[in-house]
Design a protein with these regions (language model features):
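Cyclophilin-like peptidyl-prolyl cis-trans isomerases
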Residues: 1-121
Length: 121
């Protein structure tokens, strides 16, 4: 596959936090120059542009067809070997890993910038 996805609070791949946030990408009227190259983090969503909540995906391979349509917001700076390992595990018919994969720890570096809460819809 081209990405790995996570962030569903109930573990089904269909759940969310009970709210959604505005999609911050060009097709939704928001300037976002971060492109979907290997290691980029982006918000997962349903068909509606403002349907993102807690689910996200990490690019395993460059996917320029997502640029402007999904809200890229970060990049893996260490641990792409882990991303690649997860991307290579055996999956079922719907691309879910046969063995559960969990992020045990993560650090977010905002480089000193304080970002506001995202706009909820």
């Amino acid at each position: 596959g081209f990405m790995i996805q996570g962030g569903c609070p109930d573990g089904t791949g269909m759940g969310g936090p009970g709210y959604s946030i505005k999609g911050e990408f060009a097709q939704n009227g928001v300037k976002n120059d971060l492109v979907h190259t290997e290691g980029v983090l982006s918000m997962a969503r349903a068909m509606h542009p403002n349907s993102g909540g807690s689910q996200f995906f990490i690019m395993h391979k460059a996917s320029p067809h997502l640029d402007g349509s999904y809200a890229a917001f970060g990049k893996v700076t260490e641990g792409m070997d882990v991303v690649n390992k997860i991307a290579g595990v055996r999956t079922d018919y719907s691309d879910r890993p046969l063995q559960e994969q969990k992020i045990k720890s993560m650090t977010v570096d905002t480089f000193g910038v304080d970002y506001p809460e995202p706009e909820k819809c």
